[in-house]
Amino acid sequence: MAALKYAGMEDTDSEDELPPGWEERSTKDGWVYYANHEEMKTQWEHPKTGKKKRCAGALPYGWEQETDDKGQIFYVDHINKRKTYFDPRQAFTVEDMQVKPKRYDGNTGALEILHGQDLSDKVIIVTGANSGIGFETARSFALHGAHVILACRNQSRASKAASLIMGEWSKARVEVLPLDLASLRSVRQFAELFKATKLPLHVLVCNAAVCSQPWRLTEDGFESTFQICHLGHFLLVQLLQDVLRLSAPARVVVVSSESHRFTDLLDSCGNLDLDLLSPPQKNYWSLLAYNRAKLCNLLFSSELHRRMSPHGICCNALHPGSMMFTSIHRSWWLLTLLFSLARPFTKSMQQGAATTVYCAVAPELEGIGGMYFNNCFRCLPSPQAQDPAAALSLWELSERLVQERSTPPQVL
């Protein structure tokens, strides 16, 4: 039907097709009824199947029901600035049967996953949200009503990112808070600033990362890739876990990478080695440091889920996609060239953000965690990433490292 197409829904031939002269309508509370224009009467049962139906859920996000001067109900799509007399919920009418979750793949975009979802009751933090996948992740959440916190080191770029989102939709709720994961002091300050807002926290997306960095130590004395990709996020979750508990059900989403498969964290005796995680300059290779940090992400995610799932907090890790043209490779011209050449054959930023968004809000993942996703499908990570002993060792080491660098509270 033309109305279906106008409302952004697909029309399909089925036994539900109405005879000539009939029209499908819905009440304000979502029950479907049928109008026979020839006989000027209405009924609850479908004229062919005899079944009763109701609309599935509330109106899609951004839609509003209004009444015209003649008393007829119509529907306004505020996001796309259009109106129709067709109830968009009628494309999803059900007979009190459970609908199977839709299957996604590597071509799916984040906004496609969020289609029809209302996130206006969600508060979401995204680290590294001023560019690339992080920006598309934050943008997708905000365009579906979530209150999104852009947690970024570069405040100027973060403010521009927030302006871009709000320029796309004036009602978007986007805030910027400073977060430099290369500084544990900054991580603590961010947690204090966020807690001062008194907001809940339903989703924390640990997205920020660096790759191919020249060797340098952070102000805390750690190799920068290790601290930015893992240790800073570890402390951030530790500091916000009380807010996550109070906001439960809540989710933590950790952006890892398939590159975790090409390294290990154990020494020749099978023990976790800090010199591998945070190596001295003479032993440093930037790509290997990145791979190890991504393996840390997976081990951290699984151990976090084991500890926090009894409190209503679930955690999953994911691979967003390979060789996408983001700013993560900006420190090495050779990688920039390689990524530029691969760009026509790789995912878009929207597609790269899809698995993050899926792990953050998919209804079928409610209460489920400790998993690794690629292209919105669960897959098995490397054997070492599945090692509970290694996950526990990394947790205990990370806990000790951040405690040793803790800043004593100031006396006011």
From Swiss-Prot:
One GO CC term, this protein: Golgi apparatus
Sample GO molecular function, one term: oxidoreductase activity
Residues forming the catalytic site: 290
EC number from the UniProt entry: 1.1.1.-
Motif (Nuclear localization signal): 50-55
Main location per the UniProt record: cytoplasm
Domain named WW: residues: 16-49, 57-90
InterPro entries referenced in this protein's UniProt entry, alphabetically: NAD(P)-bd_dom_sf (IPR036291), SDR_fam (IPR002347), WW_dom (IPR001202), WW_dom_sf (IPR036020), WWOX_SDR_c-like (IPR042732)
Residues annotated to bind substrate: 257
Residue span of region Disordered: 1-24
Any GO BP annotation: Wnt signaling pathway
Sequence positions that bind NADP(+): 128-134
Location within or outside the cell: Cytoplasm; Mitochondrion; Golgi apparatus; Lysosome
Function as written in the Swiss-Prot or TrEMBL entry: Putative oxidoreductase. Acts as a tumor suppressor and plays a role in apoptosis. May function synergistically with p53/TP53 to control genotoxic stress-induced cell death. Plays a role in TGFB1 signaling and TGFB1-mediated cell death. May also play a role in tumor necrosis factor (TNF)-mediated cell death. Required for normal bone development. Inhibits Wnt signaling.
Similarity comment: family membership: Belongs to the short-chain dehydrogenases/reductases (SDR) family.
Protein's UniProt name: WW domain-containing oxidoreductase
